[in-house]
Every structure is written in structure tokens, then in C-alpha cells.
């Protein structure tokens, strides 16, 4: 999955199906389960000091937040439209960079949102310091991004190819 504009997110069909299944579960069976937990905890009496009740309500809040996130994500999804292989870094691309121009010190990563993170390859969000620094650059260009300590780091774009995972 990758951000292709402010609101549109590119997803593979597989990622779309997984997120849709998660949304269906959270909107159906998971809501029923959490409602039952809340009802059971409520029957225990005093809600002010009822740890089970408060834990269930907190879980419900997190679950509803995820439902809203998934709903928005899927409403704005473009399925199957991979980024162009034109040498420009864009979300949905596997990018190879060299740190400080040292071509022996490289990193391969997927520029994509966290929902698309894979165990196969490190993923950086387009909104992360590194992601925003390289996004839009072309192969051969240099990019800079701010480190957590406030210093600037320089990288050279060696390769940018559409993700095939």
C-alpha cells in the first residue's frame, strides 16, 4: 500500500482483501465479543473500581478507532495500480540508497504506509523523515533528511523500482 496523493492509497489486491477482512471482523464478531465483555463486567457491580470494565471499554475504543482508520483507508484505495517504473522515487517503490555517497553503505527499503509493511523488506512511510526526503527524487540524485538529533543526513538514490511483493 502506498500513498499516491493526499487521500488516495495504492493497495495490492491481496492487501485490500486482508484489510477488508479485518474491517469485516472488527465491525461484526469483534464488536459482539467486546459488547459481551462490557456487559459481563457491568454485572459485577461498582464500575468505578471495576478493572475488567475499564479494560473492555479501552479495548472497545481502540477497536472503533481501527474501524474508522480501515473504513477511510478502503474508501480511498486504488487497487492494483502500481507506480510507474520511471526512475522516480514514489510510494510503492523499493528504493536503494547510499548513505553519504558511500556505495558500500546502502539500504533497500519499501516506501509505503505501515499497513503495507512486510517481513521481507524494511518499510518507511512517505511521511517519515527519510521517506519525505527521498520521495520525488530520481535515480542518481542526492537527498537530505533530518535525523532525530536535528542533524541532516545525505543519501544518494541508487535504484527505484515498483514493489513486486
Swiss-Prot record:
Keywords: Coiled coil, DNA-binding, Transcription, Transcription regulation. It comes from the Bacteria. Residues 55-78 form a coiled coil. Pfam families: GreA_GreB (PF01272), GreA_GreB_N (PF03449). GO terms for molecular function: DNA binding; RNA polymerase binding. GO terms for biological process: DNA-templated transcription elongation; regulation of DNA-templated transcription elongation. PROSITE patterns: GREAB_1. Belongs to the GreA/GreB family. NCBIfam families: greA, PRK00226.1-3. Necessary for efficient RNA polymerase transcription elongation past template-encoded arresting sites. The arresting sites in DNA have the property of trapping a certain fraction of elongating RNA polymerases that pass through, resulting in locked ternary complexes. Cleavage of the nascent transcript by cleavage factors such as GreA or GreB allows the resumption of elongation from the new 3'terminus. GreA releases sequences of 2 to 3 nucleotides. HAMAP family: GreA_GreB (MF_00105). This is Transcription elongation factor GreA. It comes from Streptomyces avermitilis (strain ATCC 31267 / DSM 46492 / JCM 5070 / NBRC 14893 / NCIMB 12804 / NRRL 8165 / MA-4680). The gene is greA.
Amino acid at each position: 500500500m502506498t500513498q499516491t496523493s493526499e487521500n488516495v492509497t495504492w493497495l495490492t489486491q491481496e492487501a485490500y482483501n486482508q484489510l477488508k477482512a479485518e474491517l469485516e471482523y472488527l465491525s461484526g464478531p469483534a464488536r459482539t465479543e467486546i459488547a459481551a465483555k462490557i456487559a459481563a463486567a457491568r454485572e459485577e457491580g461498582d464500575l468505578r473500581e471495576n478493572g475488567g470494565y475499564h479494560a473492555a471499554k479501552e479495548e472497545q475504543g481502540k477497536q472503533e478507532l481501527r474501524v474508522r482508520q480501515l473504513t477511510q483507508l478502503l474508501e480511498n484505495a486504488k487497487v492494483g495500480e502500481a507506480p510507474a517504473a520511471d526512475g522516480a522515487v514514489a510510494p510503492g517503490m523499493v528504493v536503494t540508497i547510499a548513505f553519504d555517497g558511500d556505495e558500500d553503505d546502502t539500504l533497500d527499503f519499501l516506501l509505503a504506509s505501515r499497513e503495507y509493511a512486510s517481513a521481507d523488506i524494511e518499510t518507511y512511510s512517505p511521511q517519515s523523515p527519510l521517506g519525505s526526503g527521498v520521495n520525488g527524487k530520481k535515480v542518481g540524485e542526492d537527498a537530505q533528511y533530518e535525523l532525530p538529533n536535528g542533524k541532516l543526513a545525505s543519501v544518494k538514490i541508487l535504484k527505484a523500482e515498483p514493489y513486486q511483493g
